[in-house]
Amino acid sequence: RRVLFRSYYNVYPRGTFTELARFHAGKALYLDTPEPRLDQSGTYSAIQQLQMFMEYFPQSSKKEEAQNMIFALQDKLVMKEYLSAKLYYNMGNYLGNNYQACVITAQNALKDYPYTNLREDLSILILRAKYELAVYSVEDKRAERYREAVDECYAFKNEFPESKYMKEVDRIFKEAQKMLGEGSEEQ
């Protein structure tokens, strides 16, 4: 279907139904996007098509629906990043340092999609991975990495004071402080 819509607005760029054709071409791509575990190139195409529709027709009655589809597609991309970061975390030290890959993947997802509803889950993955990175570090880097884990605990507590992960954060904080020899310090 999307080919028919695309051919219509390419052949009749000023046609009566060009607005609808552009919208439905984007919607067809939206409906055709795969689940987050799979390759997301179709999701990027759908976002691009819907953004082009909104640029060409900023006053369209379909603009809000197109914007909502873009948000849903971005959520799918965030979920893909979250699943990748979680996979790296679960792989741990298998065949290299996957904890660092987890941190980088999750931080990039937070940078690219700052308003995601998975922000808390990505942040706890970063904290867990930084802590595990400290635990399995060589002696020279261990103290620095424990400090990074403590800093991440503070950042997490500030951003998510009512988090469902707070007990785990407190446990990591106490263990990291203990390893740094700062256990008597107040939280």
Residues of each region from the PLM?
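Structural signature of tandem alpha-helical TPR/SEL1-like repeats
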Residues: D39-Q48, M79-E81, R145-E148
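Short, small-residue-biased leader/transition segments that mark boundaries at the very start
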Residues: V3-L4
